[in-house]
């Protein structure tokens, strides 16, 4: 506080006042003649300390509150401890003619102590006066007191009526509300300040797009919260204005209450700052930044109330913001930002690597062209238009594994047609049908795309069902002459899908894992190689089609136990079938049907060979009753003739295959029942292990059959053992795995009864036919 000094002395008094008084000092009375030096002289005072509010008025008066305890610093000369009697205050009414004199000092201001201190002037020049201000009377709101001073007892008193000598006592302002109620209101305001601050961050941070996403794919609780918040959040600027206006209003009211409750000064500043910053900003914003959805949904009723209360101010401002800034759309990610967001949040989103690859491939689909994923024309499997659909060509098609094969004419870049593998369902390789005949008949349309076509456009074309294979071409304008279309390669639906899933799709026919890296696929061990069945010059004396050779090989390997892969390897069996004189033909003698050359087996004659009928029909006569029946292709005889006696288990002269069972049901029942009962006995084998047939097999027409002798079969067994089992250091070989368990001998009387039973069934079936 500061106060101007009023000078009531001459030149000496003013000089002393300028030298001795600080800014808040008051000048005392002036005199016309110098005073004795030994008498005390009071020059002025200033406020040193007050336990309640005190201030200077605009007129320079010192204003204090009733009930205050003041400490005044008094300045003067020759002050002593007993100088308190020369200082007094009396009531003063400005503008009144009849004011009280200094002798009538006021009892409302009680002087309790005077402490004198030496300030270095050679005499005591300052003193501390403690002054107690008593409460005002009920009818008064303020009262003015003036300073009265004297030089000593019996000397006159001087009344200081200037502003610097006046002291105004004001009525203490009592709060409108009790302190406990103010504390409660402050607590509520702090809570509201925190709510508004938190909602301002929590609700405004909830993007409208994000709320729509949560409504569709969040948890049930999140969906419920988002459904509540989304209508309010849609009014973004209105919500923002309401929250900010409410926050400012609450903080302003809170500051005013704290100032009234605590008082002005550093304490009020620290209290309001601490309460608003810590409880109204930091804590709620930290909470709402992580749980804004739940907090916003549970306090939505309060938000709506404040939006309604602040409507007259907030709504017009929000409309101005809408017009100036436009409608709030929300955060929208483009393809690149969305992909990067997924990559950054991958450790926390629970998306596995394979799913991330699929998402990345789908997002990058529109950025890649056909040229990036196509198979170059030189790496494509194609067929020339003049090809013939024989066994070799069909085998190449089957080995390639492709279902759609381009057909070119003259050069590979000139693709004129396309062949579907399903078109070959009714094509017989023996017919050697020209490829052009099949392609002209089906006439599949060709689908061309340019090399710069995006993969999403190609995928849409493939989805229409026109074709799953497209020919990639470009316009070649290099060199002289007119531009022309140049074929660059092929693209399939599989290529597009591989780019989407970011992984290679390998099937059993793929040769490379990637068309660009040319990394070969590890060949499967069980993959069938049909090239070994192709025709070779001078390899077979009797002409047999490759497909029939393949069928015979499969039948012997799977249906005849003696030729099972455990005994005879498939490679050895194939070499055996290609051995000279194994596949033979018999031309039927029409003139003499009973001629010996028409018989494959004759009763009671030694036979050391196995026969498999490939084409034609034979008549089998077996049993004591000479029962006869006919058999066709893929029936076999003489299993015991090539087998050793100890391993003999199949003694039927005729065994019908599953290939022959589809001819007719009656034929199946007849042949199967007969073949299961015709058997020999161990007495048929001589001591030299010779086999004597107890049945006859006679041709009924031209035949083509496989004939394997015992010597050839034993050689095949030995070759298979050498191929599958390395020799031991002692030179021995591992014994073959006996997968065929030896069966007990079938007694002759049991065989006879079975033959009689089958005989009667055959007679009934024959009569029915």
Swiss-Prot record:
Protein's name according to its UniProt entry: Metal transporter CNNM4
Chain ranges inside the bilayer that never cross it: 238-258
Transmembrane spans: 176-196, 262-282, 293-313
Pfam families: CBS, CNNM, Ig_CNNM4_N
Record field: compositional bias (Polar residues): 721-730, 752-769
Alphabetic keyword roster: CBS domain, Cell membrane, Glycoprotein, Ion transport, Membrane, Repeat, Transmembrane, Transmembrane helix, Transport
GO biological process, one term: monoatomic ion transport
Subcellular location as annotated: Cell membrane
Chain positions covered by the region annotation Disordered: 717-769
Residue ranges that the UniProt entry lists as topological domain Cytoplasmic: 197-237, 259-261, 314-769
Gene3D superfamilies (UniProt xref): CBS-domain
Note: Shares weak sequence similarity with the cyclin family, hence its name. However, it has no cyclin-like function in vivo.
Extracellular side: 1-175, 283-292
Membrane-topology annotation of the record: Multi-pass membrane protein
Species lineage: Eukaryota, Metazoa, Chordata, Craniata, Vertebrata
Annotated glycosylation sites: 99, 115
Purpose of the protein: Probable metal transporter.
């Amino acid at each position: 506080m500061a106060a101007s000094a009023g000078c009531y002395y001459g030149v000496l008094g003013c000089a002393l006042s300028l030298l001795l008084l600080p800014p808040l000092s008051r000048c005392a009375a002036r005199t016309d003649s110098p005073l004795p030096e030994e008498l005390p002289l009071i020059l002025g005072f200033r406020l040193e300390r007050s336990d309640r509010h005190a201030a200077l008025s605009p007129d320079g008066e010192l204003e204090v509150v009733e009930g205050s305890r003041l400490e005044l610093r008094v300045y003067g000369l020759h002050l002593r401890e007993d100088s308190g009697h020369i200082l007094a205050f009396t009531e003063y009414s400005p503008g009144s003619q009849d004011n009280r004199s200094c002798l009538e000092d006021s009892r409302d201001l009680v002087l309790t102590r005077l402490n004198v201190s030496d300030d270095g002037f050679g005499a005591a020049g300052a003193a501390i006066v403690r002054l107690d201000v008593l409460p005002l009377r009920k009818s008064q709101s303020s009262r003015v007191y003036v300073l009265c001073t004297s030089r000593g007892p019996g000397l006159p008193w001087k009344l200081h009526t200037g502003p610097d000598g006046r002291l105004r006592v004001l009525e203490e302002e009592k709060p409108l509300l009790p302190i406990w109620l103010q504390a409660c209101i402050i607590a509520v305001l702090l809570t509201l300040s925190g709510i508004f601050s938190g909602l301002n961050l929590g609700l405004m941070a909830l993007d409208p797009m994000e709320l729509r996403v949560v409504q569709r794919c969040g948890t049930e609780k999140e969906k419920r919260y988002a459904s509540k918040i989304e209508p309010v959040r849609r009014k973004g600027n209105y919500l923002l204005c309401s929250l900010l206006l409410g926050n400012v209003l609450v903080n302003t009211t809170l500051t005013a209450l704290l100032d009234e409750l605590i008082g002005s000064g550093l304490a009020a500043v620290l209290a309001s700052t601490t309460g608003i910053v810590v409880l109204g900003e930091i804590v709620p914003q930290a909470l709402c930044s992580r749980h804004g959805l739940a907090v916003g949904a549970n306090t939505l009723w309060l938000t709506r109330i404040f939006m309604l209360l602040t409507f007259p101010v907030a709504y017009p401002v929000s409309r101005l913001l809408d017009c100036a800034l436009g409608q709030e759309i929300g955060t929208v990610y483009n393809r690149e930002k969305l992909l990067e967001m997924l990559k950054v949040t991958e450790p926390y989103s629970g998306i596995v690597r394979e799913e991330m690859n699929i998402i990345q491939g789908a997002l990058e689909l529109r950025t890649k062209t056909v040229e990036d994923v196509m198979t170059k024309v030189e790496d494509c499997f194609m067929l020339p238009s003049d090809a013939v659909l024989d066994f070799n060509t069909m085998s190449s098609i089957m080995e390639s594994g492709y279902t759609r094969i381009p057909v070119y004419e003259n050069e590979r870049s000139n693709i004129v047609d396309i062949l579907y593998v399903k078109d070959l369902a009714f094509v017989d390789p023996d017919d050697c049908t020209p490829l052009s005949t099949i392609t002209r008949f089906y006439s599949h349309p060709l689908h061309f795309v340019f090399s710069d076509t995006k993969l999403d456009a190609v995928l849409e074309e493939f989805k229409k069902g026109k074709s799953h294979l497209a020919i990639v071409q470009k316009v070649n304008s290099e060199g002289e002459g007119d531009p022309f279309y140049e074929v660059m390669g092929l693209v399939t639906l599989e290529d597009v899908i591989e780019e989407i899933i970011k992984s290679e799709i390998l099937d059993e026919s793929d040769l490379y894992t990637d068309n660009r890296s040319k990394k070969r696929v590890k060949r499967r061990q069980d993959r069938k190689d049909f090239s070994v069945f192709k025709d070779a010059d001078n390899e077979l004396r009797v002409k047999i089609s490759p497909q029939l050779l393949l069928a015979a090989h499969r039948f012997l390997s799977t249906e005849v136990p003696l030729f099972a892969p455990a005994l005879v390897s498939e490679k050895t069996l194939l070499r055996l079938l290609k051995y000279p004189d194994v596949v033979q033909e018999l031309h039927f003698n029409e003139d003499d049907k009973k001629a010996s050359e028409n018989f494959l087996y004759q009763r009671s004659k030694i036979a050391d060979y196995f026969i498999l009928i490939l084409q034609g029909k034979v008549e089998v006569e077996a049993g004591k009753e000479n029962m006869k029946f006919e058999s066709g292709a893929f029936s076999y005889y003489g299993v015991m003739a090539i087998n050793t006696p100890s391993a003999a288990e199949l003694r039927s002269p005729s065994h019908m295959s599953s290939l022959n069972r589809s001819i007719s049901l009656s034929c199946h029942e007849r042949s199967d029942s007969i073949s299961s009962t015709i058997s020999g006995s161990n007495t048929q084998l001589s001591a030299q292990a010779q086999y004597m047939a107890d049945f006859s097999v006679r041709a009924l027409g031209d035949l083509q059959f496989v004939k394997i002798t015992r010597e050839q079969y034993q050689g095949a067994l030995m070759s298979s053992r050498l191929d599958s089992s390395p020799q031991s250091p002692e030179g021995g070989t591992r014994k073959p795995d006996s997968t065929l368990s030896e069966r007990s001998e079938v007694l002759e009387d049991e065989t006879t009864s079975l033959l009689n039973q089958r005989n009667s069934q055959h007679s009934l079936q024959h009569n029915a036919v």
